[in-house]
Amino acid sequence: MLTLSDFDFDLPPELIAQVALPERSASRLLEVDNPAGATGPARLIDRRFAELPDCIAAGDLLVFNDTKVLKARFLGQKASGGKIEVLVERLTGERTALAQIRASKSPQPGTTIRLADAFDVTVGERVEPFYTLHFPADCLTLIEQFGRLPLPPYIEHDPDATDETRYQTVFAQNPGAVAAPTAGLHFDEALLARLDAAGVERATLTLHVGAGTFQPVRVENLAEHKMHSEWYHLPQSLADKIAATRARGNRVIAVGTTSMRALEAAARDAEAAGRPLAAASTETDIFITPGYRFRVVDRLVTNFHLPKSTLLMLVSAFAGVETIREAYRHAIEARYRFFSYGDAMLLTRRDA
């Protein structure tokens, strides 16, 4: 049985990308091509991300996550003067949100907090591990006006104007995430136009990425890990496109692990209910580890993930544990850039 330690690796810190490249599609792409029938080692092909249209057949379907990152981080003060840090996790109403609060002493329900030295919020009930916050006006408006972009903890600079553009995808539509669906960051309008011209199909879903995506796994036995929950919406038009893609013998390609999780969660639930894949708007805490049976996704575009992370487990389940180990060894030797602002992989499913 695989344990947490099986997903550890040593990463030279200088390979953690701290800034985005000047051009989105200028990043590198490691194609990991598993052979049909799951026999033999995968081929590792070093490419540029701009070559992606050459790797995808006409009629294949790319599925993107169109979530938009909120300016969800605030510095603030309690009425006592104590400093706090707030990270809005999700919007729950026009004037309410769930948030993480870091403070020397936990705030009590009914107390007020001053955020960004601009407005007060009232602390409501505790919804572990979050607090309910009541805003004095429309949450989204105040967050966008006074909040700060929540860059990942391994990016060591304060967010600037470049980050406000480059830590969003060009197709971001629906505000609600506190982390970017980073595989989508490599796509610019010119590359999307080339994919369209090559006959590649496109569709979107929405999964609002939560801060839990950065939470470490703290148990050696993976069965004991409690996965964070995230909200997603899969439209009927996407379900129909997937059925049509399957019918003509083409492949479904998830852009990012967030798209993958939404697709596989919806398909698993549909299968359990004895019905075909259809529209869904719900929460998922799907935890994909080796041994999982994939129902929808044939290929995956994804960045390089943190050691011992649930996302490293997901890609290992998809492409094979040894395949991912070998691919990561190659990427480190070849000086690929890692994590959110880093380079990408194109994975073929091990059993596909």
Swiss-Prot record:
What does the entry list under GO cellular component? cytoplasm
The answer to whether UniProt assigns keyword Cytoplasm to this entry is: yes
Pathway listed: tRNA modification; tRNA-queuosine biosynthesis
Q: Where in the cell is it found?
A: Cytoplasm
InterPro entries assigned: QueA (IPR003699), QueA_dom1 (IPR042118), QueA_dom2 (IPR042119), QueA_sf (IPR036100)
What coarse category fits the chief subcellular location reported for this protein? cytoplasm
Question: Which EC numbers does the record give?
Answer: 2.4.99.17
Top-tier EC class: transferase
Q: Which UniProt keywords apply?
A: Cytoplasm, Queuosine biosynthesis, S-adenosyl-L-methionine, Transferase
Specify whether S-adenosyl-L-methionine is a keyword of the entry: yes
Q: Which Gene3D superfamilies match?
A: QueA-like (3.40.1780.10)
- Catalysis performed (reactions): 7-aminomethyl-7-carbaguanosine(34) in tRNA + S-adenosyl-L-methionine = epoxyqueuosine(34) in tRNA + adenine + L-methionine + 2 H(+)
Recorded GO MF terms: S-adenosylmethionine:tRNA ribosyltransferase-isomerase activity
Q: Name one Pfam family in it.
A: Queuosine_synth
Q: Which GO terms describe its biological process?
A: queuosine biosynthetic process; tRNA wobble guanine modification
Similarity-based family: Belongs to the QueA family.
Q: Which NCBIfam families match?
A: PRK00147.1, queA
The subunit structure is:
Monomer.
Q: What this chain does, per the record?
A: Transfers and isomerizes the ribose moiety from AdoMet to the 7-aminomethyl group of 7-deazaguanine (preQ1-tRNA) to give epoxyqueuosine (oQ-tRNA).
Record protein name field? S-adenosylmethionine:tRNA ribosyltransferase-isomerase
Organism, by scientific name, is Paraburkholderia xenovorans (strain LB400)
Q: Which gene encodes it?
A: queA
